[in-house]
């Protein structure tokens, strides 16, 4: 039985690869793709989702744009990481279809309402759309099986010393999500910084004879540029967002611990910090399954095997 999911993203190189990974597996049933501002401006992230789905010949998946800015803060984007388009590197096709007339929150609500099974939400950008959905559609909480998100860190941040980018962009939204009572899987920097793609992995991907693998290799060529800065101490480039999909497909690849996680929304120094209580020091009940470790080679093999699925026959099956 396939698991119904909604991908809420801000493409973004690693968002695009997460989307490509998800759509290679029939055990995941994407009901919709929604977008928010984050890695680039809202018009560009929406266009990028349409471009990736056009590449995959999946115009059957409804797409809607969502929040153009955080709940109560000014928009911040990561164009220094993802380039002018948000997906710099490959020559992607122009969109072959249009987004839905409704916004992201209403499309998510409609798909959750219509689903005969609980739906898993997979946000890989700022959590604004998810927070708005939870705040405006309390009647649907019971139909959300889990929120599998990329965001946060138990250790150091990547946008400030204390905060990871997605949470820092809209900490108030993250606070709503983590207080919702809905089961959460948190794929934070602790695990995603271990999910590094190396030069030799990119060459494995480039050798796969299909246009989707070629696109991913070229996305990774560009993504590598930012992460070669010696300050990070990386050998490769961390594939943050695909960890969410990899966990859904094979949770055995990961080491995890149930923890209480709180969001800092006030401090000047630590705004956007995810406070992860690994040692039950607060006495608060756990609200998230936090990923701390990954079988990196197993993760890379999953990605490579998934990209090999996208033969011309597979892409033209619809």
UniProtKB/Swiss-Prot annotation:
Q: Does the keyword DNA damage apply?
A: no
Keywords, ordered alphabetically: Glycosidase, Hydrolase
Q: Which Gene3D superfamilies match?
A: Ribonucleoside hydrolase-like
Q: Which Pfam family, any one of them, does this sequence belong to?
A: IU_nuc_hydro
What is the active site of this protein? 240
Q: Which GO terms describe its molecular function?
A: purine nucleosidase activity; uridine nucleosidase activity
Q: Might you report a single GO cellular component term?
A: cytosol
Q: Which InterPro entries match?
A: I/U_nuclsd_hydro_CS (IPR015910), Inosine/uridine_hydrolase_dom (IPR001910), IUNH (IPR023186), Pyrim_hydro_RihA (IPR022975), Ribo_hydro-like (IPR036452)
| Example GO BP | pyrimidine nucleobase metabolic process
Which SUPFAM superfamilies does the annotation name? Nucleoside hydrolase
Q: What is its EC number?
A: 3.2.-.-
CDD domains from the UniProt entry: nuc_hydro_IU_UC_XIUA (cd02651)
Family of the protein in this entry: Belongs to the IUNH family. RihA subfamily.
Query: Which NCBIfam families does this chain map to?
Result: PRK10443.1 (NF007761)
Q: What does this protein do?
A: Hydrolyzes cytidine or uridine to ribose and cytosine or uracil, respectively.
Report what the protein is called: Pyrimidine-specific ribonucleoside hydrolase RihA
Q: Which organism is it from?
A: Shewanella sp. (strain MR-4)
């Amino acid at each position: 039985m396939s698991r119904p999911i909604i991908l809420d993203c801000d493409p973004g190189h690693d968002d695009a690869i997460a989307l490509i990974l998800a759509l290679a597996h029939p055990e995941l049933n994407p009901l919709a793709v929604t977008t928010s501002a984050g890695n680039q401006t809202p018009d560009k992230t929406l266009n990028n989702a349409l471009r990736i789905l056009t590449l995959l010949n999946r115009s059957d998946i409804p797409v809607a744009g969502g929040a153009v800015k955080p709940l109560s803060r000014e928009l911040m984007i990561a164009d220094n990481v993802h380039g002018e388009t948000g997906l710099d590197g490959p020559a992607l096709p122009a969109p072959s279809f249009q987004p839905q007339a409704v916004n992201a929150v209403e499309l998510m609500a409609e798909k959750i309402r219509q689903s005969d099974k609980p739906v898993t939400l997979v946000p890989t950008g700022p959590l604004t759309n998810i927070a708005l959905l939870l705040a405006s559609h309390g009647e649907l909480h019971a139909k959300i099986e889990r929120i599998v998100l990329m965001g946060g860190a138990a250790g150091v941040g990547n946008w400030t010393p204390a905060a990871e980018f997605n949470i820092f962009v809209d900490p108030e939204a993250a606070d709503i999500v983590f207080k919702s009572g809905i089961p959460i899987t948190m794929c934070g920097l602790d695990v995603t910084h271990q999910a590094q793609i190396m030069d030799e992995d990119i060459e494995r991907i480039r050798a796969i004879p299909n246009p989707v693998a070629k696109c991913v290799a070229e996305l990774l060529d560009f993504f590598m540029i930012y992460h070669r800065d010696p300050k990070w101490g990386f050998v490769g480039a961390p594939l943050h967002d695909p960890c969410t999909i990899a966990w859904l497909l094979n949770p055995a690849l990961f080491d995890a611990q149930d923890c209480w996680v709180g969001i800092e929304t006030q401090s000047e120094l630590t705004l956007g910090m995810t406070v992860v209580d690994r040692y039950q020091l607060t006495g608060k009940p756990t609200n998230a399954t936090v990923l701390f470790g990954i079988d990196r080679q197993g993760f890379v093999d999953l990605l490579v095997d998934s990209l090999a699925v996208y033969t011309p026959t597979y892409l033209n099956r619809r």
